[in-house]
């Protein structure tokens, strides 16, 4: 119900503003992932030691991780209309995810890739977002 009211309040986006909207969403997501007091569950953003304890090749665990991350991101980012989370890499010390995002008032999908690197998340695609 809250998402519906937020959607109604969001202004229509013109072509020129679409690029800045896409960059803003990606920047805000990266900030959310790297915040020391992130609203996302710790395993989803900074819990890599916890990830390494589990079997990273476990498909059930990977599916659970993607579902949990998708749910949390949809809750915290009202500009996202649809989201698909995919693991690109899930090895003992490497975790790379790809977010396939559809934004409200934007007909083109947005792909945002993140990689866990040296204790934090970095964007593999933020420079290329347009």
Swiss-Prot record:
GO terms classed as biological process: cellular response to oxidative stress; DNA damage response; negative regulation of protein catabolic process
Induction and repression of expression: By oxidative stress. Low expression in exponential phase, rises in stationary phase, translation is repressed by CsrA via translational coupling to the upstream open reading frame IdlP (at protein level).
GO CC, one annotated term: cytoplasm
Predominant location: cytoplasm
Keywords: Cytoplasm, Stress response
The keyword Membrane appears for this protein: no
Single GO term (MF): anti-sigma factor antagonist activity
Cysteine pairs bridged by disulfides in the record: none
Subcellular location: Cytoplasm
InterPro entries linked: Anti-adapt_IraD (IPR023776), IraD/Gp25-like (IPR007048)
Coiled-coil stretches noted in the UniProt entry, renumbered to this chain: none
Function in brief: Inhibits RpoS proteolysis by regulating RssB activity, thereby increasing the stability of the sigma stress factor RpoS during oxidative stress. Its effect on RpoS stability is due to its interaction with RssB, which probably blocks the interaction of RssB with RpoS, and the consequent delivery of the RssB-RpoS complex to the ClpXP protein degradation pathway.
Family (UniProt): Belongs to the GpW/Gp25 family. IraD subfamily.
Entry-linked NCBIfam families: PRK14128.1-1, PRK14128.1-3
Subunit structure: Interacts with RssB.
Protein name: Anti-adapter protein IraD
The encoding gene: iraD
């Amino acid at each position: 119900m809250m998402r519906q009211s937020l959607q109604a309040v969001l202004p229509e986006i013109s072509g020129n503003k679409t690029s800045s909207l896409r960059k803003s969403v990606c920047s805000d997501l990266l900030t959310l992932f790297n915040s020391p007091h992130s609203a996302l569950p710790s395993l989803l953003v900074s819990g890599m030691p916890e990830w390494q304890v589990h079997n990273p090749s476990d498909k059930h665990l990977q599916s659970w991780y993607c579902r949990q991350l998708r749910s949390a991101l949809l809750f915290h980012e009202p500009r996202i209309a649809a989201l698909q989370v995919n693991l690109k890499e899930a090895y003992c010390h490497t975790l790379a995810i790809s977010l396939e995002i559809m934004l409200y008032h934007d007909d083109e999908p947005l792909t945002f890739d993140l990689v866990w690197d040296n204790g934090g998340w970095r964007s593999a695609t933020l420079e290329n977002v347009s």
